[in-house]
């Protein structure tokens, strides 16, 4: 399973690690992904999703159905 948020598509970011002597080396900044079982009220069922913590905060605020609809995602296909 790839490290990608199933709702937002958030993935790893390429960055640089800078030492005290300013030597720069490439590093990969992974997304903070969590495996969660979320209740989808409109579908009256549980969905097991791998989502970022930022997406989890938005789901708590708006609700899973509204948030997925705003992203253009059909939850019936998951």
Curated annotation (Swiss-Prot):
Q: Name one GO molecular function term.
A: structural constituent of ribosome
Q: Does the keyword Ribonucleoprotein apply?
A: yes
InterPro entries found in the cross-reference section: Ribosomal_bL28 (IPR026569), Ribosomal_bL28/bL31-like_sf (IPR034704), Ribosomal_bL28_bact-type (IPR001383), Ribosomal_bL28_sf (IPR037147)
- Set out the biological process GO terms recorded for this chain's protein: translation
Q: Which UniProt keywords apply?
A: Ribonucleoprotein, Ribosomal protein
Could you tell me which SUPFAM superfamilies the record lists for this protein?
L28p-like
The source's domain of life comes to: Bacteria
- Quote the cellular component terms of the Gene Ontology held in the record: ribonucleoprotein complex; ribosome
The keyword Ribonucleoprotein is annotated on this UniProt entry: yes
Q: Which family does it belong to?
A: Belongs to the bacterial ribosomal protein bL28 family.
* Name of the featured protein: Large ribosomal subunit protein bL28
State the organism named in the record: Prochlorococcus marinus (strain MIT 9313)
Q: What is the lineage of its organism?
A: Bacteria, Bacillati, Cyanobacteriota, Cyanophyceae, Synechococcales
